[in-house]
Design a protein with these regions (language model features):
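Non-catalytic, usually N-terminal nucleic-acid engagement modules in DNA/RNA processing proteins
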Residues: 1-75
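Catalytic cores of enzyme domains
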Residues: 68-257
Length: 257
């Protein structure tokens, strides 16, 4: 069964695939798989190598590369889920690569229904690095993961024995938001403040100030590029403006598929 799935994944030109039994998946913050998919037995995890767009000094080009990857991965997720249903008679559900995710007091909108990092580690696709991303043995942390939940019973792939992360510390030192200063933990709020300046917090600050100033100042505010960036973010969705912890990582920089 695994080999049939691997061959299908290869035809989609996905870079890697791993399998994890539901019992081997453990996430400290995401809800139990049973609450999402009663009867889920396995997770099929797909790995995609980032384009070199993430190296661009132009944040918009870097983010465009990520958006291209996300669009491609959504299509692949759906195609593989359909393949599992039609070829194996299985039930299958796709997991969001990013949004939508639960919005509630407990998670503060920063926790996905399935932790793709923990799923990838359980599926033998890498191990956690100093930047708290999963480092793939070939592609390093320049890897995006997606997943499909299924009721097929598929045994887990062997875990990565030797962590690809070299613990060089470049990601910790290079984080402009100082979000990685505490070992083993990412300060999400510090990361978001730097990484997503035109997200929800940026919009709250803008409109809070907008309501307090004069009509003349309001006109100036909506003519400022800051407002245009907020408008663009509201139109196309969350945008990342920092890829530092990926860019400085030496693991997999010259890897090929």
């Amino acid at each position: 069964m695994k080999e049939r799935i691997r061959r299908f994944v290869a035809r989609l030109e996905i870079d890697d695939v791993g399998f994890a039994a539901a019992s081997d998946y453990r996430s400290p913050l995401s809800p139990p798989l049973e609450s999402i998919f009663p009867g889920a037995r396995s997770i099929v995890v797909l790995a995609y190598k980032e384009l070199d767009s993430c190296d661009s000094p132009d944040a918009h080009i870097a983010m465009n590369g990520r958006m291209d990857l996300m669009e491609f991965s959504r299509s692949c997720n759906y195609k593989l889920a359909r393949h599992l249903e039609r070829s194996f008679g299985a039930r299958a559900m796709t997991v969001p690569v990013s949004y939508p995710m639960a919005q509630n007091e407990e998670t503060k909108a920063t926790v996905g229904q399935v932790s793709l990092r923990h799923a990838a580690a359980a599926a033998g696709l890498g191990a956690f690095g100093s930047n708290n991303l999963v480092v793939h043995p070939r592609f390093g942390c320049r890897t995006v993961f997606t997943a499909i939940l299924t009721d097929l019973e598929i045994p887990s792939d062997p875990p990565v024995v030797e962590n690809p992360c070299t613990a060089c510390g470049l990601c910790v030192q290079g984080c402009p938001g100082k979000a990685l200063d505490e070992p083993g933990r990412t300060d999400v709020m510090k990361c978001v403040k730097t990484n997503m300046p035109y997200g929800l917090s940026g919009a709250i600050r803008f409109w809070g100030k907008y309501g307090e100033v004069s009509a003349t100042e309001r006109k100036a505010m909506v003519r400022d590029p800051n407002f245009w960036r907020l408008y663009q973010a509201g139109h196309i969705g969350p945008q990342y403006f920092c890829f530092a912890c990926m860019n400085v990582c030496p693991v997999g920089r010259v890897a090929t598929t």
